[in-house]
UniProtKB/Swiss-Prot annotation:
Acts as a component of the essential kinetochore-associated NDC80 complex, which is required for chromosome segregation and spindle checkpoint activity. Pfam families: Nuf2 (PF03800), Nuf2_DHR10-like (PF18595). This is Probable kinetochore protein nuf2. It is found in: Nucleus; Chromosome, Centromere, Kinetochore. The keyword ATP-binding does not apply. GO terms for cellular component: Ndc80 complex; nucleus. The lineage of its organism: Eukaryota, Fungi, Dikarya, Ascomycota, Pezizomycotina. Keywords: Cell cycle, Cell division, Centromere, Chromosome, Coiled coil, Kinetochore, Mitosis, Nucleus. Residues 159-454 form a coiled coil. Belongs to the NUF2 family. Component of the NDC80 complex, which consists of kpr-1/ndc80, kpr-2/nuf2, kpr-3/spc24 and kpr-4/spc25. InterPro entries: Kinetochore_Nuf2_N, Nuf2_DHR10-like, Nuf2_N_sf. GO terms for biological process: attachment of mitotic spindle microtubules to kinetochore; cell division; kinetochore organization; meiotic chromosome segregation; mitotic spindle organization. GO terms for molecular function: microtubule binding; protein-containing complex binding.
Amino acid sequence: MAFNPRMSILPPQPQQSRQRKKEEEAAYANMRLPDREIVGCINELGIPFTLADLQKPNPIQVQMIFEWFGELLMNKTRQTVDPAMRAAAEDVCGPELGEAMMPSDTRNLLGFYVSLRRLMLDCGVNDFSFNDLYKPTHDRLVRMLSYVINFVRFRESQTSVIDEHCNKAEQTKARIEQLYVENQNMEAQLEEMRHNRRAMEVLVQEKTVRNEELKKRLLELRRSQEKVAARLEEAKTKKGELAAELEEKTATKIALKQESAKLRPYVLQSPSALQASLAELSNTLNNDKAHIDALDRRSRALQTSTDSFSVVASDVASCIKLLEEIAIELAKEEEENVKNARQRDALTERGHNVREVERTEALLKRQLAKWVDRTAQLRTQSEEKAQKAMEKMEELRAVHRKLTEERSEKGKDIERRRVRIEQTEKKMLDLKENIENEVHAAHDEYLKMEAHIKLYITEMEQAI
């Protein structure tokens, strides 16, 4: 029993290619511009161009036209790609052999071709090749110029949108740079504030330690002041008592002197009585002297105590002055504490500002990281494109080398063929000469044979 194979719903490959080719031809028919319009557009660019130039394109003129379009649309020319291509040539062949093995015109044209190929892909030309620059034809040139001119017209119709996006990109870039500068300034201010905060914390700590020491010293001075005040009051009390006793003794002495003066006339009357009175008076006098000496000693002791009290009073005055200074210092400390509280509040507020700045910084860092990633992606893409360009250049170099080898081989083959042709011609000339000689010889032989035959026939006839 026979089975039919599964039928595919996909059209065969040649049919797909034919459909794609028909679509491309239809799109090209819509995009194709008349030759006169193309020539007019190129003349408007300032490049002299005629219908004859379009019918028979010149590679140098075509390269100039495409270079102008590259500068207009991509800001790329052979001069702009020269540094990168020179560096690539020096990297591949070395700084000494780069210029010799890869001339500047060739490498710059190759580099510009890579950028131009990207532009042509954007314009819709997918089969752009190096031959379109090196060996252009009329149909290919008309097609590429039609696509490029239509792309330029579309770009000019969308100039406002393009300018708007470019301005937005420039504004975003300027804003990023401004935010980066502000971030740097904020970081510097934050570092300065942290430094000031650490310095203020050290000063506050020193002031706190000094305040505690002054408080302890003030308490000790207050205790000493209380002790000195108690001793002063006790000394004042003793001084008052001793002064009252001294006044009492002085009054008693004066009274005794007055009584002695009154009794002196009576004592002179009787010697025995006078003797007795004298003895009594001398005893009294001795007692008074002893008492006066004692009072004198006591007065000196009181004077010493008074001097001591004056010294103590001066010490107390100095202590009071020191206490006043301490009170002033405490007032200053209170003011410093108030200032520290204000500064602490200011630091708290600045801390909030710092947190806000840190949040802003984190946001900016995220944005910066995004831009860095984007830059890295762009750099990676550019490196990949550069690698592809290097690979393409290697392929082109290999193709060039292969073409050079083929050209040299073809030259050698042509030379060999020319030599063979010359040898063949020489042989043919020799053969021609030989054949002519043989023909002449054969003709001579034929004449001889004919003469012999005629002679033979004549002899035969004569014989008959």
